[in-house]
Regions:
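Small-residue-enriched hydrophobic alpha-helices in membranes
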Residues: 1-22, 32-93, 99-230
Length: 230
């Protein structure tokens, strides 16, 4: 079965999923359904027990310190570009990408060392990808960024285009989780997860809903202010 974030170290994968989990549950401790989904992502990424515990802690800790730990690890990883791209994708999912939501994502990008030009290009990548609505295999193809007309711009800005599309949870997550759920069902393991859910009852749609404003992504600003000392 295809693995999530397969080309990255255990520490990087744990930091990436930990950051997503921490932001998604910024104003509350993760529910049982949310935790089941988050742990399914950890399973699909083949995380070690140590990193699974770290991701779980990030989903239940509300001070923002676990998020800071995750971001500090990602500062030196190409996954930082994938993380910001995913956050923009999640924020735009409900077509209500507010100025406050954008400002919160920009805080994360700035903390990760992503400059304004790079952020603007990642934003363009999200918009152009949404227009094409590609499948997982198409996005991972070497020619995909060229088709969007962004490959040279991304290269010149210092973004590693070979790694950008390999860490996109917003694109790869549903398909990988669907395969994971089919594997569980074949073994007779029950689960409430629906990776294609678009509502607030668990699954990728639940995470998107939380990050896009369904549960107030804009309200995560309070935690970000604590983390970044603003």
């Amino acid at each position: 079965m295809e693995k999530l974030l397969k080309d990255y170290s255990d520490l990087e994968k744990g930091a990436y999923l930990g950051a997503i989990s921490s932001i998604a549950t910024a104003d509350h401790a993760a529910s049982d359904e949310e935790m089941e989904y988050i742990m399914a992502l950890a399973e699909s990424a083949d995380l070690s027990d140590e990193q699974r515990r770290a991701v779980s802690q990030a989903a239940t800790e509300l001070t923002g310190q676990e998020l800071k730990k995750c971001l500090d690890i990602l500062k030196d990883s190409d996954l930082k570009f994938s993380l910001v791209t995913d956050l923009i994708s999640f924020a735009e999912a409900d077509k209500k990408y507010s100025d406050e939501e954008k400002a919160n994502i920009e805080k994360i990008a700035h903390y990760l060392g992503i400059d304004q030009q790079q952020f603007s290009l990642l934003d363009q990548f999200v918009k152009k990808t949404a227009e094409v609505n590609p499948g997982v295999e198409e996005v991972s193809h070497p020619s995909f960024l060229s088709k969007l007309g962004l490959d040279e711009k991304l290269k010149k800005s210092g973004i590693n285009i070979n790694s950008l599309t390999k860490g996109l949870l917003s694109i790869a997550g549903p398909m990988i989780l669907a395969n994971l759920m089919r594997g569980r069902q074949s073994r007779g393991v029950s689960s409430s997860l629906n990776p294609f859910s678009t509502g607030g009852g668990g699954g990728l749609g639940s995470i998107i809903s939380m990050l896009s404003g369904g549960r107030g992504f804009s309200r995560t600003g309070n935690m970000f202010n604590r983390v970044f000392g603003l």
